[in-house]
Each structure stands twice: as structure tokens, then as C-alpha cells.
Amino acid sequence: MAQTIKRGGKGVRRATAARSAQRKVQTARQQTGSVLDSVLRWLPFSEETLHRILMTLILAAAAGLVWTVAVMAGIPALVSEQAAIIASDAGFKVSHLEVRGVNRMNEAKIYERILGQNDRAMTTLDLAALRDELNQLPWVKDARVSRKLPDTLVIDIVERTPHAVLRKPDRMVLIDDTGVELESVRADRAKGMLVLSGMGVGQRVEDLTRLLDAAPALKPQVSEAEWVGNRRWNLTFKTGQVLALPEGDETAASALLSFARMDGVNRLLGGKVAAFDMRAPDRIYMRVPGHADEVAAEKRAEEQARAEAKRAASAKSDEG
């Protein structure tokens, strides 16, 4: 009797398929390795350095995560507070205040701003915030705040320089060369200083400085400057004479320079003319006090003389 022997056909096929898959995986690994090798060859550092960089990034990310959790739990604040207490107990707290550079302003204004820092731990001082607060004072152009261990807070002040006096309806105010108002002053303190007036003149201080710089010979002779109608200047000299300038920065500077030249030749300042008007192009008008009265008196005298001559002629005709 014939016997049929069955072979494991399916097992053979599975083994063949497994070997084929293994070859594909090995081929893919070889190709991937080749690609990675190619990339690594192009990098400016070795594979070991790359591993170190990756490890550093992982550790940094982990540290950031730990710090975030700590902040959310309030741990840094507690540590900072405890450190401040330790520093204060060791004598590192604000016990003295040293102020430098104050000549004109009221030094008490600075102490008022810093008073809340007394007995505070030196480690908890916000120097930038203190500086910003001091810079809000009108007289302070700039301030620097620093620690002098163990217990002194040092304030260095750069003061603004008074430049002129702003005349307001109810008071006189010192201003610097940029128009910043410093403090109210009495009239006797304003004596000898340039006086400014007019609506919006505080925003035109630097423009006025440039205008007066156009005629250096006249600049020290100007005692007052009025900003008229938000468009032009009237200058009053120490002699009491007034010069009306035209509108426009360049036009006004040119007119002032022309006036300076005429004054150098004809000595206009200190003369009989009370007011000079240079608003019209290429000409100047002058007003002499009492001149109109003199002209009117001369005219009346001429008319009276003519009337008397006419009466005399009429009387002589009647006699004839």
C-alpha cells in the first residue's frame, strides 16, 4: 500500500517569509546607518559631542520643569524671604541714607521717597524701582541708587539747571532749558533771569534758545520773550524796548540777525525808539514815544499860523 508523506509546506513558507523580512530590516538598518553616518560626517562635531549636547538639553529641560514646579509651590519666595531675614539679622539692612549731588532742590523730597526703605534688608532692595521713583521729582535730571554694605543706601543726584522763569497768571515758575517746571519762585528770586510768557511757551524753550543763538551779541540783552498767538515771538530787551519778530523759525532768526547788524551800526538799543516791528518782509517799523503828539502839535501850530495870516490879510484888505 502506498503511503503519502505530508510536508510542512506552510511552515517552510513562514520561515522563508521571516528570513525575507529579516533581510529587509537589515537592509533598512544599513541604509539608515549610512544616512546617519553621512549626516554626522557633515556636522562640525563628533558623535560623542552630539550625545553630550542632547544630554545637556535633556537635563536643562528637566531642570526647567523642576524650577517651574518649585515656583508654583512658592519655594523660591520662601527661600528669598528667609535669606532676607538672615541678612537683616546680620546687620545688612538699610540704616543710613547718603545723598550726593543736591545743591538747589529740597533734600527732604528725596528722604520722603526713600523713607519706606528704612530697616529693609539690603538684599531685597529694588534699585531700579527706586531710581525710577526719584526721577519723577521735578529737580532730578538723573539719579543713581547703589548699596554700600553693610547698611547704607547711596543716592547720587544730577540736578536740572534753572534756565528761565515762566510767568503764569498767578505765579512765577523756574524752568530748565527743556521747559520742565522746577518750582514756584518769588519775583525777587526771578530778578535777572530770562522771563517767558505766552500760551504754550513752555514747549518752545529750546526753539527760543536756537533763535537767540542766531544773534549772540543780542542774546544777553534779552530780558523777556513772549510767545504770541502760538506762532511768533516778541522780545523785550533790558532797555525796555520791544522787537516784534515774524512767524517761522528761519524767518525769525534771519530778522533777528538783521536787527543785530543794524544795532551794531546805528545803536538802536538805548535810543528813542520804543518798539521795532519786523513782521513785514524787508522793512522795519519804529515807534517813538510822544512822536505822534509832537507831530500833532506841529500840525496844530501850522494851522494856527495859517489862520492868523489869513486874518491879518483880511484885516489889511478891509483897511484898503
Swiss-Prot record:
Keywords: Cell cycle, Cell division, Cell inner membrane, Cell membrane, Membrane, Transmembrane, Transmembrane helix. Residues 92-160 form the POTRA domain. It is found in: Cell inner membrane. Residues 1-52 are cytoplasmic. GO terms for biological process: cell septum assembly; FtsZ-dependent cytokinesis. GO terms for cellular component: cell division site; plasma membrane. Residues 74-320 are periplasmic. It comes from the Bacteria. The keyword Cell membrane applies. It is a single-pass type II membrane protein. This is Cell division protein FtsQ. The gene is ftsQ.
